[in-house]
C-alpha cells in the first residue's frame, strides 16, 4: 500500500491504499504519505519548482509583465499572442508553466490556465508531488468560478465533488463539445439541458446556452444534486449515471448491495465508466485534502 501511495500520490489508488492502512490499523494517519500539500512561501515554492525542473536560467520577466498588463487591460487575444512568442522556447520549464498558468487563472482565462497546469503535471516526476507545496497542488486542482459553484452547491452537494466532475468532463473549457454532443463545463447533453432548464424555470432555452459557463454550472449542479438524492448520496452511482445513464447505474447499484467500496467499483461492467468513476473520485479526494479548511 505504501509503495502505491509513493508511486502514484495523486489519485484513486493512493486514497484507497490509505484507507486500507487506516482500517487495518497498520499506520497512523500522520505517517501515511498522502499528497496534502506542504505550506511554503511563494519564494520557497518557486525554489522547489526550479529544483524539480533541473533547467538553468530563467524565462523573460519583461514579456511576463507585458502579458500581465495586457490581461489587466482586457486585451486577451494580444496577451495570448505575446505569450506564444515565449512559449515555444520555455514550454519545458516548470517555473514558466506555473507562473503563466497562475497569471491566466487570475485573469479568468481558465481553459488556458488549466492547459498549462496539465502540461506542468505531465512534465514533473509524479512521485515528488507527494511532498509538493500546497500552492502547486492547488494549481493542478483549481477552483475557477468559485462564487458560482459554492452558491449553487450550497449545502446540497459538496462543491469539491462538482469541481472533480468538471475537471474530468471538460478540463475547465466552457466552450468544449464532446463527440456525442455534450456541451460546456459539466458536459450536459442538449436534451438533458432542456429538461433541467424547465425544472429551473428557465425559458427559451437553446442548446448553445450550455456554453454559458454560469448557466452550465447552474444546470449541472442541479443535475448532480438530483442524482445524489436518487442514489441515496452514493457518489459512485451518481457518477455511473452521469457517465453511462440510469439503466446500467441502477443495475450496478443493485448488484453492489452489501459489497465493499472496492468490490462495487470493480463490479462496474463498462470499463470506460469504471475508469471514469475512479478518476473523478481520485480528483475529489485530492480536492478535499488540499482545499478543505482553507476557505
Language-model region placement:
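Alpha-helical segment of the N-proximal tetratricopeptide repeat
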Residues: 55-85
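Catalytic glycan-binding domains that act on GlcNAc-containing polysaccharides
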Residues: 1-37, 78, 88-295
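Long, low-complexity, highly charged intrinsically disordered regions
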Residues: 31-58
